[in-house]
């Protein structure tokens, strides 16, 4: 959907006779999509761009091509534009060894004046896009997997990211994703979680924030009660381990 919208808008803006207006709209509305796509084409001619998919969220736009995902900041002219990517990589590199659910393995490259974030595509469909009835049917299974993930992660205290902690280590605190609600990938056939993506706003905080993050921005998940069912499974793990 996003690819069609961006392509249509880009062609529509192309007929605007005043250049500065064309440039302004392409940068502000489409986030300089065409130049970023051309830069990626030039840097990675080996990719099949005919089957490219486009997504956007937070501060980035995402090109999904074959088995790879490429993220670039929407507003690449901003100061410290690379800082969020670098922060996310540090977090994921440090947390990954503690978790059995897949977390993106990030690398960077520059092309056409833009910094791209590249990671292998994790297979699956966004949990929020699965029908409510099906989520409810498999809610216990999903909640168990999420609880195990949060439990595993609660033991992560990597020295390499101590400088990113805003508070000292203490009981009940852990490294949290904070926004899992829209970033859980799941196999729609088995309904097993395949990955947790987009860690740029992760941080060290009270572990209760992780459960809130399962429903915070989605009324659908609030109605299902994914936070409560996951929290109950997590308490069982604490009791028996």
Language model feature labels by segment:
Residues 30-37, 58-59, 69-117, 133-141:
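A conserved alpha-helical element in kinase catalytic cores
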Residues 24, 76-84, 220-229:
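Short, flexible/disordered intra-domain loops and linkers
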Residues 2-49:
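Juxta-kinase regulatory segment immediately upstream of eukaryotic protein kinase catalytic domains
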Residues 95-98, 125-164, 168:
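Conserved kinase catalytic-core helix
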Residues 114-126:
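Conserved short submotifs of the Hanks-type protein kinase catalytic core
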Residues 60-66, 155-209:
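Active-site acidic catalytic loop and adjacent metal/ATP-binding pocket
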Residues 44-65:
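ATP-binding glycine-rich phosphate-binding loop
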């Amino acid at each position: 959907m996003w690819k069609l919208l961006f392509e249509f808008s880009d062609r529509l803006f192309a007929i605007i006779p005043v250049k500065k207006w064309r440039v302004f709209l392409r940068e502000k509305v489409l986030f300089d999509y065409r130049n970023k796509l051309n830069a990626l084409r030039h840097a990675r001619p080996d990719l099949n761009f005919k089957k490219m998919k486009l997504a956007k969220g937070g501060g980035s736009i995402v090109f999904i091509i074959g088995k790879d995902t490429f993220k670039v900041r929407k507003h690449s002219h901003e100061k410290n534009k690379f800082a969020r990517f670098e922060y996310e990589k540090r977090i994921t590199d440090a947390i990954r060894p503690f978790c059995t659910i897949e977390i993106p393995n990030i690398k960077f490259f520059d092309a056409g004046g833009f910094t791209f974030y590249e990671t292998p595509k994790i297979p699956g469909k966004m949990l929020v896009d699965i029908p409510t009835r099906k989520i409810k049917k498999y809610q216990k299974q999903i909640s168990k997997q999420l609880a195990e993930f949060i439990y595993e992660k609660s033991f992560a205290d990597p020295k390499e990211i101590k400088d990113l902690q805003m508070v000292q280590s203490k009981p009940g605190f852990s490294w949290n994703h904070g926004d899992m609600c829209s970033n859980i990938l799941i196999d729609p056939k088995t309904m097993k979680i395949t990955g947790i993506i987009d860690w740029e706003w992760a941080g060290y905080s009270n572990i209760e924030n992780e459960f809130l993050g399962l429903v915070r921005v989605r009324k659908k998940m609030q109605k299902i009660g994914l936070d409560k069912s996951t929290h109950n499974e997590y308490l069982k793990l604490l009791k028996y381990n």
